[in-house]
């Protein structure tokens, strides 16, 4: 049986920070970052206390052992995604991964007149790199229209594609609305038009089984810290033939075979081509443990747990009479809402006073607020494997009381 209360015992944050503002801590900002398990923390601490070495840069036992540990990590991630180890590139996070695609592929292959398709719901990490590439190359950024409830539909993608479209980039699950997009169907449509697909998996990979072979996406980006792993580590998956054609986003030690005074350089094959400099080795080891932890819980159980929590949370918030919910029907464990008549940041500040950590603002998705939501800011509560119904009850109680409290305070 999936028991989030028992799962909390594996996370020292719940032991070491049991309260906030004098009230029991309710952590509902998991779409931003997640707590780390004992196993993840131990892996990071062990690197700094027992295993410190560089990788691929020494002829001694510690370095050899680190080489093997990184190889094991790469194989673990490859098995996790159902791809080849050579298609797994370690990066600083989803932002680093998306920029690697934008600059490594887009800057090299896109030209004036070409088109990139994104949506208005994208996180800034999947918008601004493409804006930059458009500025540098003269290509154009266009948008797939969202449906009335904020989804990407196959029909709308089909309409948005043109003979000029070269690449489509979108999130499998949006970080604001939380809709699970039909990735496989969308990818097939794009490929039928000869268009590449770059998938932002920051909000999907931590929560559901991801099979890149089945989805057939060309690129996938995700972060470790959103899936119980350390900060500063992420992954870029890319089909090997595409990675082989790309230039590195960052150059330096460890990503080249040779270079000469005439400025000529021969880069190593992927993935090393994209891993210049000393990597976040502690992060790589910690991410491996996070993947193993999630696999041990089972993604079917995680999906079902979050589905039930989402349904429960929607019901409880609507019962308060104070909540305006913008994504009640979305699949992910994300609820974006406002307390009626209260500015989002004021609401989040009040929730903080009740020991509840939620996110407020535009959630790095400024285009969505300007177009679809048509509101300056929202509050976002997001769930994960250790979130309980008690956490939802605390949120609902605060929303119920907060509307009246804040009305009295500001009026």
Task: Kindly label every feature range from the protein language model.
Residues 1-411:
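Pyridoxal 5′-phosphate
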